Amino acid sequence: MRFVIVTGLSGAGKTQAIRSLEDLGFFCVDNLPPTLIPKFAEACYQTEGKIKKIALVIDIRGGKFFDDLFESLKYLKEEGYKYEILFLDASDEVLIKRFKESRRKHPLSPDGRILNGISMERNRLREVKDRADNIINTSELATRELREAINEIYGEQDQIENQLVITVLSFGFKYGIPLDSDLVFDVRFLPNPYYIKELKQYSGKDKKVSDYVMSFDVTNKFVNRLEDMLNFLIPNYFKEGKRQLIICIGCTGGRHRSVAIANTIYEGLKSKGHKVNIDHRDINEDIHKGGKKL
């Protein structure tokens, strides 16, 4: 089990760090009182491998409870529980700027002087910083760069490469565009099997319908160009921190053309090793039914 304790200065990026760890599959708990760490660790280790990665945020928001941290760490060591400490740091100037921009009070500056609070916090955290396994100074880091630093330390390579989860979703425009769509492609310009008597009753999942849709030159040109676009977009979306991508393919009723094209795109992405799901939202809807869907 990997047991990570995330701590550091207020405003240094602990919230973003824990979100990045969560994206890497860590079970995360924010602001756990240090005195509860031993019992929490015991409970996690008793899951017999069901929970493999844990991350806890511990900071001075715990007030007097923070002073129990070292006693809890001592207990973990004595009981043979391995742990790591990640410390987030930043310069005084950057921290002051962040607090002013967020208009939040520093938890240790009741008098309103941010610098005094930062100074007090540095003193209280000096020992835990000295014991940290990893220290990340976020003064010059953008959110994406902090995420990359977290990935480099705590991510497994194959996990990082396949972190973007893609969903290819077919739908019918008559039932509304999916609200959670990232990319929407309209394939109503393609020849429609609905008007072919022997195909109307089938869906784009049936080979005879799929073969019909894919038999046209315009269809293949569209699919090739769409795949080229996705090959360009996907790594760049991931680079900018996107972890879920929903690609929506729409036709009139969501039963024939969009289904056939969505399946083709799904198979292409799957063959390239992407983590991809397929969903046909409106495939079973009555073709004459009205109304909206999410």
Curated annotation (Swiss-Prot):
Chain sites annotated for binding GTP: D59, I60, R61, G62
Annotated disulfide bonds: none
Binding site for ATP: G8, L9, S10, G11, A12, G13, K14, T15
Keyword Nucleotide-binding: yes
Pfam family, one: PapZ_C
GO molecular function terms noted in the UniProt entry: ATP binding; GTP binding
Keywords assigned: ATP-binding, GTP-binding, Nucleotide-binding
Keyword Ion transport attached: no
Family listed: Belongs to the RapZ-like family.
Role, per record: Displays ATPase and GTPase activities.
Protein known as: Nucleotide-binding protein CLJ_B3680
Native source organism of the sequence: Clostridium botulinum (strain 657 / Type Ba4)
Classification of source organism: Bacteria, Bacillati, Bacillota, Clostridia, Eubacteriales
